[in-house]
Amino acid sequence: MVSGVTYLKRGAVFGSGAFGTALACVLAKKCESVSVWHMNANEARVVNQKHENVYFLPGAPLPANLTFTADAEECAKGAEIVLFVIPTQFLRGFLQKNSHILRNHVVSRNVPVVMCSKGIERSSLLFPAQILEEFLPNYPIGVIAGPSFAIEVAKGMLTNVCTAAADINMARKIQRIMTTSDGSFRCWATTDVIGCEIASAMKNVLAIASGALKGLGTENNARAALISRGLLEIRDLTLALGGTGEAVFGLPGLGDLLLTCSSELSRNFTVGMKLGQGISLEEIKRTSKAVAEGVATAEPLERLAKKHNADLPICHEVYNVLYANGCAKRSFKKLNSCKLADEGLPALPRTSKM
């Protein structure tokens, strides 16, 4: 049993996709009741009747103390922690419509707010927590990041993630709330918020590259090289944007990158496999219920890298394949034909121990 964890009366989750549902299952172990916001009222009723999110996470029974609702205010009322798991490109629209609910029911009671969405907003090049900060200025916002396939989280399989906040005490507060007493979902605290968000966004793009390698028929050596070099791209952008680098070689960076780049449970990896096999992005979109996050992230990531003069060759080639009529085979040939260089790169700055 894990000591020092915190229990609450009520939790709220905005976003009912696979990961939002999975995190709600975790909260249900820590709260007397949990409410999940789902945009479709009829579907919310079906989920409550079946005790299963048949739309986004079939095969994972939902706890009895977890309910879905299409009423955002009902979801927020009385919550002692609020998680956001709304897709990044739709986050701003939700907040424009519902931020008054957060101010009335969350900010006024100093409730912890945790961003769990991943990606980069196309219009602003902001990360999810930065978008939320525009609507809740000067309010402490946490982030959850790390290797966590939704179905495994929902079924209580062993998972470790990071909780991040600018104030380490807030990160630790969220850590105590989200960590389950049986240790099946365990959190580690950090202050490298931007590092967590960058890693969470970039690993999806890099997973497309890894899947494309698989689709082209390569084996483990090539994937290991891609993961290693991809990790350095995460590091370079993190340092360019002012992160400490603490998250890069931990759970949000290395951990999530290894998971997402190595399993067909990852939608991003699967999209990459299909691209490597010569299937067009249009055909993939047409035959898929949900598009992988990395597809939406690759384009704003390309612009963000240029803005900060960050050299991200692997991510750049993913962008070329997705949006510039590139070919996966030619892209990898180009990457493997680049100018010879030293492996030794500047070390990460030292960070204080947590």
UniProtKB/Swiss-Prot annotation:
GO molecular function: glycerol-3-phosphate dehydrogenase (NAD+) activity; NAD binding; protein homodimerization activity
A matching Pfam family: NAD_Gly3P_dh_N
Keywords: Glycosome, NAD, Oxidoreductase, Peroxisome
Active site: K203
Compartment list: Glycosome
Enzyme class: oxidoreductase
Catalytic reactions on record: sn-glycerol 3-phosphate + NAD(+) = dihydroxyacetone phosphate + NADH + H(+)
Annotated residues for binding of substrate: K118, R267, N268
Listed EC numbers: 1.1.1.8
Leader sequence segment: none
Cited SUPFAM superfamilies: 6-phosphogluconate dehydrogenase C-terminal domain-like, NAD(P)-binding Rossmann-fold domains
CC per GO annotation: cytosol; glycosome
Motif (Microbody targeting signal): 352-354
The keyword Oxidoreductase is assigned to this record: yes
Binding site for NAD(+): G15, S16, G17, A18, F19, G20, F90, K118, A150, R267, E293
One GO BP annotation of this record: carbohydrate metabolic process
Tagged with keyword NAD: yes
The family this protein is said to belong to: Belongs to the NAD-dependent glycerol-3-phosphate dehydrogenase family.
NCBIfam families assigned: glycerol3P_DH (TIGR03376), PRK00094.1-2 (NF000940), PRK00094.1-4 (NF000942)
Protein name per Swiss-Prot or TrEMBL: Glycerol-3-phosphate dehydrogenase [NAD(+)], glycosomal
Lineage per the UniProt record: Eukaryota, Discoba, Euglenozoa, Kinetoplastea, Metakinetoplastina
Encoding gene, per UniProt annotation: GPD
